[in-house]
Amino acid sequence: MLCHITRPDSVVLEVEVDPKANGEDILNKICQKMGIIEVDYFGLQFTGTKGESLWMNLRNRICQEVDCVSPCRLRLRVKFFVEPHLILQEQTRHLFLMHVKEEIIKGSLRLDAEQAIELCALLAQAEFGDYKQNTAKYCYSQIYGQDPSHDTINTISLKHKSLEGVSQASAEYQALQLVSSLTYYGVEWHFARDSEGQQLLIGVGQEGLFVCKSDFTPIERLMYPVIQMATQSGRNVYVTITKDNGDSVVLLFKFVSPSAANGLYRAITEIHAFYRCDTVMSTVKMQYSRDFKGHLASLFLNESIDLGKRYIFDIQRTSKEVYDRTRRALFNAGVSVNGRGISRSLLRQTKVDREERMCVDCRETHVLKEKLQRLQEALTCALCCEQEISAAFCPCGHMFCCYNCASQLQCCPVCRSEVDRVQHVYLPTCASLLGLAEAKTTNSVLRRTGISEDCANKENARQM
């Protein structure tokens, strides 16, 4: 099955997949082509039968989400926006900025005149480099909605000149920092109507829900702590909230199709889990429905059979887990994380080149050091990332963090069950494990000294 994927900058990529494969196979192939490791921030959108924009559930089969028509046309977009300093790859940052620019042009992100001038200069520096009178182009009218005056053009030009020498990556980072300060940065918008038929825009963000008029004029803001639950029934979504006086109120939002209603229902759960939870709860991750054939098979064959299974939510990691996972991938590739973007192919090539330069004995030592490092990471507190794991939650028994961090938690970050008490545990310390390993390898290292010197001499000869 052929798939055409459109990026935010209108570049179309082509991949071929099995129609019975999961949607994540498409995303993984696209991100691999672009050298992106931070896959979890992105998703694939398609247009529904009523013209609504919908997210493909990447955990389900492609044929369950869209019509198996070749070529399948999808859009690569940022699903979960994070702060610019949390983005570790330049390629990821570039796609973030392109998506943000698209949102500004559509009107869902609004800048004042001063911000628009600064953003125009940064975008020009990122796209065209240092200021040149004959080639300088600015997108002020696109992002601000008004044609610039002569004075405005001069101001943008002066701002652009002041950025001389700034690299493309740095200009994109500064532009993304500017946009991330806006109120609606990272908010996902859904078109709906209230119980009286008035057109609304429902925005789902990191802190809660924004209820706005069709022109983005705010009506009400619902923070996550006041939202009791959200349910979907057909084309309607019901959001139960708690008022200041303690009373519960149910808000009704109507949509053009059940798929659009399901989009808001999914967004509330997925965005809340991604930004505000330590880990995705199993009740969210494993929630699914079955078609008629799958239901019959589960009754007569096996309850755990995958036939006809369709996951409700498309969320597998939280923002903290994605960031930590990316750092580990960069670390395992032997690359220090300093906020600069590094392509996946470059990481892989760096690791291969390093391994090829090693002799067999040196490679064994390097592999052992990597294993020790992974062991040390596994025994380190997942919350503070400084102390060693020294506590177990009772009654669930999970060991996740140090005693100081565990004593401040009321529920287990792994299974979300309530914590009755925290039990002090004594695991082998990282220092003792590393000392033991060093003792075991000392004789081996001494015997290999001559070989290692030869390896080093060969390396120096190559560099010369």
Swiss-Prot record:
Keywords: Cytoplasm, Developmental protein, Gastrulation, Metal-binding, Transferase, Ubl conjugation pathway, Zinc, Zinc-finger. SMART domains: B41, FERM_C. GO terms for molecular function: ubiquitin-protein transferase activity; zinc ion binding. Its EC number is 2.3.2.27. A zinc finger (RING-type) spans 381-416. It is an enzyme of class 2 (transferase). Residues 1-279 form the FERM domain. It is found in: Cytoplasm, Cytosol. Gene3D superfamilies: 1.20.80.10, Phosphatidylinositol 3-kinase Catalytic Subunit, Chain A, domain 1, Pleckstrin-homology domain (PH domain)/Phosphotyrosine-binding domain (PTB), Zinc/RING finger domain, C3HC4 (zinc finger). Pfam families: FERM_M, FERM_N, zf-C3HC4_3. One of its GO terms (cellular component) is cytoskeleton. It comes from the Eukaryota. The keyword Nucleotide-binding does not apply. The keyword DNA-binding does not apply. Pathway: Protein modification; protein ubiquitination. It catalyses: S-ubiquitinyl-[E2 ubiquitin-conjugating enzyme]-L-cysteine + [acceptor protein]-L-lysine = [E2 ubiquitin-conjugating enzyme]-L-cysteine + N(6)-ubiquitinyl-[acceptor protein]-L-lysine. GO terms for biological process: gastrulation; negative regulation of Wnt signaling pathway; protein ubiquitination; ubiquitin-dependent protein catabolic process. E3 ubiquitin-protein ligase that mediates ubiquitination and subsequent proteasomal degradation of myosin regulatory light chain (MRLC). Regulates cell movements during gastrulation by acting downstream of fz7 to antagonize the frizzled-signaling pathway. Interacts with anxa5. This is E3 ubiquitin-protein ligase MYLIP-B. The lineage of its organism: Eukaryota, Metazoa, Chordata, Craniata, Vertebrata.
